[in-house]
A protein has these predicted regions:
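Short beta-strand elements
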Residues: 872-887
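Short amphipathic alpha-helical "recognition" segments used for binding
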Residues: 7-9, 18-20, 166, 223, ...
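Acidic/polar hotspots within intrinsically disordered regions
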Residues: 6, 775-776
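Gram-negative bacterial Sec-dependent N-terminal signal peptides
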Residues: 1-35
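Glycoside hydrolase catalytic-domain context in secreted enzymes
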Residues: 37-768, 772, 778-847, 854-856, ...
Length: 887
């Protein structure tokens, strides 16, 4: 059976933890002064930044100093079979115990933004627990948008504390793959497109997780930048691109945060699976970086026993093989060990690493922390995190903030107005006690004094069945459609099950056999027309009776069939689809749920404020698929354009984890990007819209005007077989700068209700000199400090993210026009001036030299650029660097 839940943390243990917390701020780089200047951190949320430092862990059982001694004591007592049992799964999410030695089962959980609901011990089915709810935090894109190390700490601490309370040993996050492709289905899980930003934020995130006696698992190592054929696509970047762009966040996780675990990627790397790549694992990760933790696979990876064992894989996790002893790292490994094909010393190294992790997080320590979960403080933290990630993209004529005392009637529209997102996205889905929708947040904020009207614009094109009528519930309690995937066209061999928010499916060019089903309950009696728009073979069943016979559908033609439904009765609806394209199920009710164009435009003209909550959902942003394009789903562009024409002050509030095209952007006065905001999203959005929270987020990704402006598409380097990363080091904004392409909204862009002035840039020296670096030398032997004064020239308190970009003026290799090398978030009262400070190291000046296989900073001039975004540079200054070769 699954492990029991922890009860409430004891008062004695809590007192001990809180006492230890007093000194932890400095250890995590969060000073008391920084907290005092941070307006969104209150006494109620302060606890989440005060996590146990390493010196407190030493005090509790003197754990860290004993780890290696305990490993040396335990390892010789293990039999060969016991050692092998530890390097592969014994269930869907755990490796086994060796109870005679006090080695317990090590349990893992998905959850980069909330601990996932409990999975059955040996299958993918939900365990059906009633006490596995967790706090649903904003995903890491929102944390990246905060550009705030404190927010990464806050996020990591809540995640770690809740994982510990759920009795988990490893949390499978954070993710640090870069947003190379806007279509990538998992961009929302990661930290944006820039290697420096991701590397900077992942360190405090990991430290905070692990301070809770839980191991963080950084993923996916490496180059998992598309879901299209993700288990087979061959990533083939050149070495310089690999080192400068796609590895720095992993390197920081190892060297600066001492992360306990790393999860390998699904994809191949230069012809072999990334989990068994000698170059990635033994040479770089465990060799150059000195990683002491464990490398574990993702679930269902394509490896072989010998290469995986010899090239550094430590744990093979879940597959579809029924018998865990048949895993590649189980019986086949034992046979190779007995035959002498794999040395026992190789296995011993893996077991040492596993024991090191278990001992380091206190799995054999009676003083191990117990954590806490679903507390009011954690809900406050979720709201704080959501608020700090909101990005104000456009605010002409100061349309925002809205003034509550001037509002009598507010019109709310858009597919995300009352949608909840926590249950979707794939492995990152969270079972939360509740989730505040944007509509609910506005109603809670404005109360009964303001009339808030929700309207659903009808489209001139096809509309899916809305979830208002669903009685089927995802186990999180959210109205949802179940989707079953089959291996055969007779649809008898079930492959997997999942859930989607709407009855629409995109096979992304891969032949699929799916059954999309839910129970619906009409609210009126009469003729209901079921409509199917698809490319492929479709059939529709109502209560297991075929309403639309199996037929070949064409996307240009809608197949319709009407039947009489009775109000209050439940009907089982099943859409079966076979094909490699798309299918959507819609309907028309006797009195349509949707408002006509005439109705919603008339309401928009009269309203005191119009807010359109659009964007994406986890039907679009989710694991296992990429989007087909950057177009907003559901004809949103059409509706937004019409709203802006009749009411130019319409606020367009986008929710989603990846870039979308916005052809109406020039006509919009107010555009906001809110990401997926977690369980407190609606409250945080309302705070920002009504001026109770001054937006301070900045874009961690570039928002292109069109998909063809992006490097992978422009260079035809996005396909199912291989990606050579043709753009090289010119990822994201670097590509746009190099190609002189104007984006829709630039990397680092984000407005405030305040205004800020930059002045007085200063360098600690006009020139620096340095010697050759080794692979282990990050900082070099000298640094240069850059400072700049920032003044809040407005009458509104606010925060500004000051960004430092660097350029090697004359380099021997192509280098970006701007590379992010520093950022500093300043909280400024109205009229206040503060100084932003940055330290540049030799590594910051360097590129990866393929000739010497090392970092190289060339002599010459470097230009420092200080700005509010990559496209809004306010100050510039140059310095000289002199490289001195070692004698």
């Amino acid at each position: 059976m699954a492990k029991p839940q922890h009860g409430n943390i004891s008062s004695n243990h809590k007192k001990k933890a809180l006492t230890a917390c007093v000194s932890s701020l400095i250890c995590l780089g969060v000073s008391h002064a920084a907290l005092a200047a941070h307006p969104t951190i209150t006494p109620q949320t302060l606890h989440a930044l005060t996590v146990l430092p390493d010196n407190e862990k030493l005090r509790i059982g003197d754990r860290i100093s004993q780890v290696e001694d305990d490993i040396n004591r335990l390892l010789p007592q293990l039999t060969l079979k016991e050692k092998v049992s530890l390097v592969h799964a014994a269930g869907k999410f755990h490796i086994p115990a060796i109870e005679r030695l006090g080695i317990h089962e090590m349990w893992m959980s998905d959850g980069p933004h909330g601990v996932r609901y409990e999975i059955d011990r040996n299958s993918w089915a939900p365990a059906g627990w009633t006490n596995d709810y967790s706090t649903y935090l904003p995903p890491l894109t929102a944390i990246a948008a905060s550009w705030d190390l404190n927010m990464a700490t806050l996020h990591g601490n809540v995640l770690g504390a809740e994982a510990r309370h759920r009795n988990k040993d490893l949390i499978l996050g954070p993710g640090v793959n870069l947003a190379r492709l806007p279509l990538y289905g998992r961009n929302f899980e990661y930290m944006g497109e820039d290697p420096f930003l991701a590397a900077s934020l992942v360190v405090p995130e990991i430290k905070a997780i692990q301070a809770n006696d839980v191991g963080a698992t950084v993923k996916h190592y490496a180059l998992n930048t598309q879901e299209l054929n993700r288990t087979k696509v061959n990533a083939k970047p050149d070495e310089r691109t690999l080192r400068e762009v796609y590895l720095p966040a992993f390197e920081a996780a190892v060297k600066q945060a001492n992360v306990h675990a790393i999860m390998g990627a699904y994809n191949e790397f230069r012809g072999t699976n990334a989990n068994q790549s000698k170059h990635l694992v033994n040479t770089i990760l465990k060799g150059e970086w000195g990683f002491q933790g464990v490398l574990l696979t993702d679930w269902n990876v394509d490896i072989n026993t010998y290469d995986a064992a010899m090239n550094g894989l430590d744990i093979e996790m879940g597959t579809d093989v029924a018998d865990f002893d048949d895993y590649f790292m189980a019986k086949p490994l034992l046979e190779m060990l007995n035959a002498g094909k794999v040395p026992v010393s190789v296995l011993d190294d893996k077991v040492r690493r596993i024991l090191r992790v278990q001992l380091s997080i206190g799995m054999m320590d009676k003083h191990r922390l117990s954590g806490e979960r679903n507390t009011q403080a954690h809900r406050d933290d979720a709201r704080t995190l959501a608020a700090n990630g909101i990005v104000l993209l456009k605010n002409d004529n100061k349309v925002l903030p809205l003034h509550a005392d001037k509002l009598k009637h507010v019109l709310v529209l858009g597919p995300n107005a009352d949608k909840r997102h926590g249950f979707g996205g794939g492995s990152s889905e969270v079972k939360a006690l509740y989730e505040i929708s944007p509509l609910a947040g506005l109603k809670a904020k404005l109360g009964d004094k303001v009339d808030i009207q929700l309207m659903r614009p009808a489209s001139s094109q096809f509309m899916p069945i809305p979830n208002d009528y669903l009685t089927t519930r995802h186990w999180t309690g959210t109205p949802s459609w179940q989707i079953n995937y089959y291996n055969d066209n007779k649809m008898t061999q079930l492959a997997s099950e999942s859930w989607i928010a709407d009855p629409q499916f995109n096979a992304k060019g891969q032949k699929q056999f799916v059954d999309i089903k839910a129970n619906i309950k009409p609210i009126e009696t009469g003729s209901h027309s079921f409509n199917i728009k698809a490319d492929g073979q479709v059939a529709l069943y109502i209560n297991d009776t075929q309403l639309i016979a199996s037929t070949q559908a064409n996307q240009g033609h809608v197949i319709s069939k009407a039947m009489t439904l009775t109000a209050g009765e439940t009907y089982a609806v099943s859409l079966r689809y076979q094909g490699d394209k798309q299918a959507t199920l819609g309907w028309e009710t006797p009195n349509s749920l949707y408002n006509t164009e005439q109705e919603y435009l008339a309401a928009a003209k009269k309203a005191d404020a119009v807010i359109y909550f659009g964007g994406l959902s986890h039907a679009d942003d989710r694991e296992s698929i990429d989007r087909p394009d950057m177009v907003l789903p559901g004809q949103q562009d059409e509706v937004i354009a019409k709203l802006l024409k009749v009411n130019p002050n319409t606020v367009v509030f986008m929710i989603g984890g990846s870039a979308v095209e916005m052809p109406w952007a020039d006509n919009a006065k107010a555009v906001v990007w809110g990401w997926y905001g977690g369980m407190e999203a609606g409250n945080a959005y309302a705070d920002m819209l009504l001026g109770n929270q001054n937006p301070s987020g900045k874009m961690p990704i570039t928002l292109p005007k069109k998909l063809t402006d992006t490097a992978p598409i422009a260079l035809n380097d996005y396909n199912a077989t291989e990606s050579v990363y043709s753009e090289g080091v010119f990822i994201g904004y670097r590509w746009f700068e190099q190609q002189n392409i104007a984006p829709l909204f630039a990397f680092g862009h984000g407005l405030s209700y305040s205004q800020f002035d930059y002045s007085n840039i200063r360098l600690s020296s006009a020139d620096i000199a340095n010697n050759d670096m080794t692979n282990d030398d990050i900082a070099g032997n000298d640094t240069i400090t850059v400072t700049v004064d920032v003044t809040n020239t407005s009458k509104v308190d606010g925060a500004e993210v000051v960004q430092l970009y660097l350029h090697d003026v004359k380099a021997s290799v192509p280098r970006p026009a701007k590379e992010l090398k520093g950022f500093d978030k300043l909280w400024l009262k109205a009229g206040e001036t503060k100084t932003a400070s940055f330290t540049l190291t030799q590594r910051d000046l360097s590129f990866w030299d393929v000739n010497t296989n090392n970092w190289l900073a060339e002599s010459g001039q470097f230009e420092v650029m200080i700005g509010a975004s990559v496209a809004d540079i306010r100050l510039r200054k140059r310095f000289d660097y002199q490289h001195k070769a070692k004698p």
